[in-house]
Amino acid sequence: MKDMAKVYDIRIEDFNYPLPDERIAKHPLAQRDECKLLLYKGGECSEHVFREIPELLPADSTLVYNNTRVINARLRFRKPGGGALIEIFCLEPLAPADYALSFASTDGCEWLCFVGNSKRWKEGKLALELTVDGKPVTLYAERNGQSGNAFRIRFSWSDGAVTFASILDAVGEIPIPPYLNRNTEPSDTEDYQTVYSHIEGSVAAPTAGLHFTERTLADLDRRGIRRRELTLHVGAGTFQPVKSEVIGEHEMHTEFISVTRSLVEDLLNAPGKIIAVGTTSVRTLESLYYIGVAIHDGDEDPLHVKQWTPYNYKGGLSAKDSLKAIAGYMDANNLTHLVGSTQIIIAPGYEFHVIDGMVTNFHQPQSTLLLLVSAFVDGNWRSIYDYALDRGFRFLSYGDASLLLRQ
């Protein structure tokens, strides 16, 4: 068991650093894989270009990335008669709760949403006129209750042959990060997606993957680096600031995860290092370990990892035995996909079980993502970030990348 009190009492102000606005990349480079890459290996930093990553990864590595695709989650309505602007930000489906079924709906669906200017919309339907495949369609939104600071929104529309996915594609906007301090631009439609994204459901991109190009992927294949994928749908909670003084008082957001039976097998038989692309892949792979532990221990609800589960676990099960438990569970239940959720917080004091390295961007001060990086590099995050700041690296979602390796 980890020293729970020490983790609980981690002060978020200890993870602050000066980040001038001019160091926040507002747009990506024209050629994604020409960005800078910081390599952290053996406690030392060195500067490279991202396209060199196939040569920098250890031989026989398995690279695991998040195949989620960002949806056009932001909808802008106006109250009747040219009234107040009401912005609806779709977070996750409620009915149907399955992402694919909700996107395929033709007779309405319900989502959990943030609502901008909600005080000006207490009741009644909002209507939005749009065009889908050349045909006029009216989208309606109606409040159906509240959950914390979010709302249950019932969507319906006038044409029963049109899917909700088509509506979002036609009139929704890509929700770029708020810290970019700019409106969504047409270029973001392509720029804010990874080249390998194909499972729709995120409201934010797994940004470490934005640097990969078809050229980089081909070079990885030529070098014999295995490429595998998983799914974590990134929620708006990824931008949620830590408002408490200590981590123990911060509540992590819950996110949907999905892995295939073949990925579990590939992890079991990986000949070399397992490298996660992005913190979302890190959180999914490390959550898998605790799902396997729960299955092994016979828990009634093994597919949902709680925030503090890792720090309450007494230990003992190897990563291989955990993955074998998952494989057995999937085979026994005839599952090709394991679908669950995770609320895991990875902070200094966390013991990594699955990953040996990660590709990640440079994160906001006082964020849970910075805590995750610190946990992986044994507290040396500040020397890494000082190196990046001193050498002109660009920060946050559209910024440069790092490859963090353990010896």
Language-model features and meaning:
Residues K2-Q407:
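Surface-exposed, charge/polar-rich loops and edge strands
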